[in-house]
Design a protein with these regions (language model features):
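Conserved beta-strand hairpin/beta-sheet module of binuclear metal-dependent hydrolase folds
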Residues: 77-132, 136, 228-249
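Zn-dependent metallo-beta-lactamase
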Residues: 35-110, 344
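Sec/Tat signal peptide C-region and signal peptidase I cleavage site
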Residues: 29-34
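C-terminal regulatory/interaction regions
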Residues: 36-54, 315-344
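Bacterial N-terminal signal peptides
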Residues: 19-27
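Metallo-beta-lactamase
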Residues: 68-72, 81, 87-89, 111, 118-120, 138, 197-198, 206-209, ...
Length: 344
């Protein structure tokens, strides 16, 4: 048995058993006000039970919250994905679901949102924004990391909710447009909505808002227009830290894709002095758990005392990832060359 597997399965069984019990009880609820109130109470109990079971399932270091949320059907379960928003720095907030991140970078002149997740989790993001006392109409830009639905699927609804301009690379705007109407596998196959095409970002572009002067880098591979952003300034009292958001490593299949992966890795390694890696998913291979996980760091942040180091300030996370990207890219090129030589 994998270490922690029994603990995880036991915790997840509790989720399904308790949720099923509440659903069976709700089947007998009639239209009266009292019965409606009982139905709401039952739903609340189911939600609380799911949260408790999830918490119970993450007591082992081998099964942190990041991993639970990522596993198979759990990435589709709304109750499993519901987490409270949290403040990471004076000007950075996490407002997304459990498995994929959504961040808000604040400035006195307006805010920038990084990624939107997808339905059925967008209502959670809207609620989390309000819980952090952020005025959604102060969000000026929504930046999409790449054209996969789990990163842009909530953009249309949040575009309307905030009035912000949605921003992506031209290559991935094309991907986004091609996704319109396709089934969303995390929302019972409902058709995917796409945002209005507001604004393009290209390699070397700058996006300035308040004290933030962001520099855009493209890294084709995971998608044709995958990007990462440097220049993010994070405040923790009197301290400031240099942040970076997004991926950047890896290339597309084939020799040309692998060679592009090497170029991407060189670009990633050229960014120096990064102190905070703002992840696009709660987990982050190859750093593993709990060191690379957003929620593991958040747990440490919640109990941080004055004078303690900030758990999200960790230059090694980005440096290790950058080095791994370079090593993996070179291996991929060698593998593709060997395939070409052998004819396989």
């Amino acid at each position: 048995m994998t270490p922690g597997m029994g603990l995880r399965e036991d915790g997840m069984r509790k989720v399904w058993m308790l949720t099923a019990s509440c659903l069976m009880a709700a089947a007998f609820v009639g239209p009266s006000v009292a019965q409606n109130a009982e139905a709401e109470a039952a739903a609340a109990r189911a939600s609380a039970a799911a949260a408790q079971a999830r918490a119970n399932a993450t007591t082992s270091d081998s099964d942190p919250l990041e991993k639970i949320c990522r596993i198979g059907p759990h990435s589709r379960e709304t109750e499993i994905q519901k987490i409270a928003p949290f403040k990471v720095f004076d000007n950075l907030y996490h407002v997304g679901p459990c498995y994929v991140t959504s961040w808000i970078l604040t400035t006195p002149q307006g805010h920038i949102m990084f990624d939107t997740s997808q339905e059925p989790f967008v209502g959670l993001i809207e609620d989390n924004i309000k819980k952090m006392n952020i005025n959604p109409r102060d969000i000026k830009y929504i930046i999409i990391n790449h054209g996969h639905t789990d990163h842009f699927g909530g953009a249309k609804r949040l575009q309307e909710f905030t009035g912000a301009r949605v921003v992506a690379t031209p290559q991935d705007w094309k991907m986004i447009a091609e996704t319109e109407g396709k089934p969303n596998n995390r929302d019972n196959g409902k058709p995917t909505d796409v945002p209005k095409h507001d604004m393009d970002l290209n390699e070397g572009d700058h996006l300035d808002l308040g004290d933030q002067h962001l520099i855009i880098h493209t890294a084709p591979g995971h998608t044709p227009g995958n990007l990462f952003i440097e220049g993010i300034v994070l405040h923790d009292g009197a301290q400031t830290y240099k942040g970076i958001w997004g991926g950047g490593g890896g290339g597309a299949p084939g020799l040309a894709g692998a060679e592009q992966g090497v170029k991407n890795a060189e670009k990633v390694n050229a960014v120096k002095g990064v102190q905070v890696y703002i992840q696009t998913h709660a987990w982050q291979d190859p750093n593993g758990y709990p060191g690379g996980g957003v929620h593991e760091r958040a747990k440490k942040l919640a109990t941080r005392k004055p004078g303690d180091p900030h758990p999200f300030v960790d230059a090694n996370t980005w440096n290790d990832r950058a080095k791994a990207a370079q090593a993996n890219a070179l291996k991929a090129v060698e593998k593709e060359k060997q395939k070409a030589t052998s004819g396989k």
